[in-house]
Design a protein with these regions (language model features):
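Catalytic-loop motifs flanking and including active-site residues across diverse enzymes
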Residues: 86-94, 168, 251-252
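Hydrophobic helix-and-loop "lid/oligomerization" segment in the mid-to-C-terminal part
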Residues: 1-28, 48-49, 66, 100-253
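Hydrophobic, well-ordered secondary-structure segments
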Residues: 39, 88, 92-95, 117, ...
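Metal-dependent de-N-acetylase/amidase catalytic core
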Residues: 81, 94-103
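Hydrophobic, small-residue-rich alpha-helical packing segments that form membrane-like cores
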Residues: 1-90, 107-109
Length: 253
């Protein structure tokens, strides 16, 4: 897997990331939650001999990327009835389609919990298929075989508790997102992929520590922003743009 570094790489599919992956011998690139506007980037990957499959849930532009396949419910020619899947929901659909009807139930049982967490964390419209994904995924979270997820639940104080979408949004998601915000995005992925219980415990503790660091940085930025507002004369407050060279890019965005 490759997760773009928020500060160094920016968001979405980037040429530097494509070149790096090509150098590692990657010949098939599957995007998740990005790439629908990456026409030039996908063309660049093609020029390097890479096949690209784009999965995304953002609105399409007039020109689609020249990928082998573009999976997005917002495609003008897509007849899929539910248009509000999260990026992880679209990825789940691809997994189910590739697995075939005979494996659909097994794959859904394994991956629905991760899709539920992603859907709730992305604050998607909680209706129709999203509601089904979240309801089923959270109902089976205690039976999930993802060791890293159980380690994170334990470290977050949610072991042996009924996990709701609210707890996903305010407890689990901030810890998972903290890795990317603080410049260590791979840590969250490594945790979810981890098969060693001891390493999973270590990564979960590190992730929670990063989240506490993120909270402290965020609070400091907030205090400085309030100070800037208070120093601005009332007659100049009709519209305010606050900035500082010292504010952490991963936290303000």
């Amino acid at each position: 897997h490759y997760i773009p570094r928020r500060i160094e790489d920016g968001y979405g599919l980037g040429r530097d990331a494509i070149l790096s992956l090509h150098g590692q011998g990657v010949r098939l690139l599957v995007t998740v939650d990005c790439g629908i506007t990456g026409v030039e980037e996908v063309a660049y990957a093609n020029s390097l001999g890479m096949d690209v499959v784009v999965t995304d849930h953002h609105e399409c532009k007039e020109e689609l990327p020249p990928a082998c396949a573009v999976v997005d419910p917002h495609r003008p020619d897509c007849g899929y009835p539910f248009k509000h899947l999260a990026g992880c929901g679209v990825a789940l659909k691809l997994v189910l389609a590739l697995g075939g009807e005979s494996r659909e139930e097994a794959l859904l049982s394994r991956y629905c919990t991760l899709a539920a967490i992603g859907t709730a964390a992305d604050v998607m419209q909680m209706s129709d298929e999203n509601r089904t994904i979240v309801s089923r995924g959270l109902a089976s979270i205690s039976r999930s075989d993802f060791i890293g997820l159980h380690a994170l639940l334990h470290e977050a104080g949610l072991s042996d508790k009924t996990v709701t979408s609210v707890q996903i949004g305010f407890v689990l998601a901030p810890r998972i997102n903290a890795a990317g915000r603080m410049g260590a995005a791979d840590m969250a992925a490594d945790l979810l992929l981890c098969t060693d219980p001891h390493r999973a415990e270590h990564l979960a503790r590190e992730l929670c520590a990063l989240n506490r660091e993120r909270q402290a940085v965020e609070q400091e930025i907030y205090s400085q922003a309030v100070e800037q507002i208070e120093e601005t004369p009332p007659q100049e407050r009709s519209a305010l743009v606050l900035a500082s060279d010292t504010w952490h890019q991963g936290v303000v965005g």
